[in-house]
Design a protein with these regions (language model features):
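The feature encodes the CheY-like receiver
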Residues: 57, 75
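C-terminal output helix
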Residues: 106-116
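Active-site residues of response regulator receiver
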Residues: 53
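Charged docking surfaces used in two-component/phosphorelay signaling
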Residues: 16-24
Length: 122
C-alpha cells in the first residue's frame, strides 16, 4: 500500500511541483489550499505525512499544528513545515509532530530525503 501525503499549500505552482516529485517517488498525494479545508481533509484522508505551508488563507500553519496536537489521533501524524521565512522554524520548535522544516524555494533532493525520514522510508 502506498503511503499517503497531504500537501497543504496555497501556491498552485508549489503544489504541482511537490505532487509530481512525490508521486514519482511512489507516494499517494493529495492537496488542499486553505487552512479551513485542511483540517477536514486530514480527518478524511488520514495521511502518513503532512507538508504544511505556514501562510495560508483561512487558518495559518501554526493554528493547524495546534489543532493536530490537541487531537489524540491526528497528533501522531508527522508534519514537515514549508516556508520562505527562516523565522518560522522557531515558531514550530515545541511541537513534537513537526519533524522537519523545508525552506522555499525547495531543493528537491533535500525535500525527498526529509519526506522519507519523516515517513519512515529511510
Amino acid at each position: 500500500m502506498k503511503k499517503r501525503i497531504l500537501i497543504i499549500e496555497d501556491e498552485t505552482s508549489s503544489v504541482e511541483l511537490l505532487m509530481l516529485v512525490l508521486m514519482r517517488e511512489g507516494y499517494e498525494v493529495k492537496s488542499c489550499q486553505s487552512g479551513r479545508e485542511a483540517v477536514s481533509m486530514i480527518k478524511e484522508y488520514h495521511p502518513h505525512l503532512i507538508l504544511l505551508d505556514v501562510m495560508l488563507p483561512g487558518m495559518d500553519g501554526a493554528s493547524i499544528v495546534r489543532v493536530l496536537s490537541d487531537d489524540e489521533q491526528l497528533g501522531s501524524i508527522p508534519v514537515i513545515i514549508t516556508s520562505a521565512l527562516v523565522e518560522s522554524q522557531k515558531l514550530f520548535a515545541t511541537y513534537p509532530q513537526v519533524k522537519d522544516f523545508c525552506l522555499k524555494p525547495f531543493v528537491l533532493k533535500d525535500l525527498i530525503i526529509k519526506v522519507k525520514q519523516a515517513i519512515g522510508d529511510l
